[in-house]
Amino acid sequence: MLKLFSAFRKNKIWDFNGGIHPPEMKTQSNGTPLRQVPLAQRFVIPLKQHIGAEGELCVSVGDKVLRGQPLTRGRGKMLPVHAPTSGTVTAIAPHSTAHPSALAELSVIIDADGEDCWIPRDGWADYRTRSREELIERIHQFGVAGLGGAGFPTGVKLQGGGDKIETLIINAAECEPYITADDRLMQDCAAQVVEGIRILAHILQPREILIGIEDNKPQAISMLRAVLADSNDISLRVIPTKYPSGGAKQLTYILTGKQVPHGGRSSDIGVLMQNVGTAYAVKRAVIDGEPITERVVTLTGEAIARPGNVWARLGTPVRHLLNDAGFCPSADQMVIMGGPLMGFTLPWLDVPVVKITNCLLAPSANELGEPQEEQSCIRCSACADACPADLLPQQLYWFSKGQQHDKATTHNIADCIECGACAWVCPSNIPLVQYFRQEKAEIAAIRQEEKRAAEAKARFEARQARLEREKAARLERHKSAAVQPAAKDKDAIAAALARVKEKQAQATQPIVIKAGERPDNSAIIAAREARKAQARAKQAELQQTNDAATVADPRKTAVEAAIARAKARKLEQQQANAEPEEQVDPRKAAVEAAIARAKARKLEQQQANAEPEQQVDPRKAAVEAAIARAKARKLEQQQANAEPEQQVDPRKAAVEAAIARAKARKREQQPANAEPEEQVDPRKAAVEAAIARAKARKLEQQQANAVPEEQVDPRKAAVAAAIARAQAKKAAQQKVVNED
């Protein structure tokens, strides 16, 4: 009795809420064996035939490829695609693919050569000696994905299951009307399917393996039971026919009684599900060493003369398959990829077959009936009764129409499996699944935009934080640099601190006064002298720095000279425009000329004492000399135009002439006695000597043109001139001696 109850509990099945029983229409195509289709002339292989990102291209236009050769590289969730036959890559461009939107996706276009040559195949007949990681990597690199309709990469799914999988379920229900691809595959290739199941079990090591199949497939059930006759590790469960019992959550509940939580996965409850076609593809990848390049596709509908199931190469145009099956289109013929409830209408027939293509339905006009006009919802709740996911389709419909995305999300629109049961039973002919698909797409787009905005905000905040850190570090550096004394001031600060400490120490010492003795102030005097010497040294250093800064800038010197010349020109113009009655004092003019010459000599000395690297422009020196000569001539004219009543002292003029000649001789001697390092411009010295001689001649002329009424003693004048020359010579010699 205990064994009877155990057997009953072992084979127990559960039933889910909702569901419908539409006409099956499977007998049109499940009665004939699988057959091959002739190769098409051109194949279009989309790079993305799965959930996830497309792989990286590893071929280019003009390459020769063989069947099974990878066209892309698979990394992470990127699943590679392979060449369905041998040929030449003629283009890599966007092409419309099998999708409700009919958007173009990047595809590899291959022209077949007709030879259909395989790449070298390396099968692992002894797969049990391989590690779990090696088997998963081989399955992934051979492009195996879920062939039941989702297209999730099988290798990633097996890797994510890990060691927590207790139950492996093989989905053989195939509940949607018209589709018989899995049914025919189990009838013709039952042994290979079971071998693929054993490979999956070897990878996952589950406690139990369950095959769920509907009772409307008697031939497939018989073939599987025959293959599993000697096996005790795999259990075949026959379930009642009900749509959509082939859904992942529904079949999991039917076989185990466990429900997948909202927003969760079946692996959260220790269950992993694979399709019958996926198990067959795993067997071919591991044991035969063949990547997935073809799959079983059902060709059915009253518009097809020879319905059945065929081995269709991936990338084959839909038109080629339909024409091979005797397609007879009507005026408004439609072709549906998938079943009548979950499939979608193709915009044109040039789209290729992909990994998730399981059926091509070409119904006649009478087969599906006339399209009904959409009417208003009457709140009958028939859709809620039929929903297998226990949702409220009428509420989701209103939320979808009203763009109320938050409420739709709260009502678990993500759990909708888009089975179409609600639309099937709706008396108002509302295409509820279309509304739900659009709403889920909009929610996904909003979440993607929010994710991008959050990432952009995070990048902005990180940048702002980095800028704030850099600013704080910069301010800290500036603050420390301002507070920290310079290296040259550290000694002065240390000396000041030492003096303060010394004074404090002296203040604490008692003062002893002895009668008849003088106090010893030598230490204090020495300290005072040291401070004075230090202050003088510091002042001298600052003075040298300022002088160096002043002398070292030749441009500043030139600017100052130009300003002085401009001021001199302005004074000359003012004197020239003065009233005629104004009396001109020749001595004052001579003094001003001497001051101007002194300033000129000072500027020349500053330029001469500049850095050795400074180059003297001879043209500029010539221009300055010419300007000086012009000023001298102007002063001579002013003195000549003075009033004749002005009396000139010939002795004073003689003395000035002698002094001028002495200065001229001194200038001539200075270049010889100058330091060898000093660079002297010979042209400039010659110009200055010429100017001095001209001034001497001018003074001699003034003496000759003196007023005749004045009585001059020639002997006194000669004596005075001789004395002046002697004094000038003596002063020049004394200055030379001092300079040496």
Curated annotation (Swiss-Prot):
Residues 605-615, 637-647 have a biased composition (Low complexity). Binds 2 [4Fe-4S] clusters per subunit. It is found in: Cell inner membrane. GO terms for cellular component: plasma membrane. [4Fe-4S] cluster 1 binds at C377, C380, C383, C426. Its cofactor is [4Fe-4S] cluster. GO terms for molecular function: 4 iron, 4 sulfur cluster binding; electron transfer activity; metal ion binding. The complex is composed of six subunits: RsxA, RsxB, RsxC, RsxD, RsxE and RsxG. Part of a membrane-bound complex that couples electron transfer with translocation of ions across the membrane. Required to maintain the reduced state of SoxR. This is Ion-translocating oxidoreductase complex subunit C. It comes from Escherichia coli (strain ATCC 8739 / DSM 1576 / NBRC 3972 / NCIMB 8545 / WDCM 00012 / Crooks). The gene is rsxC.
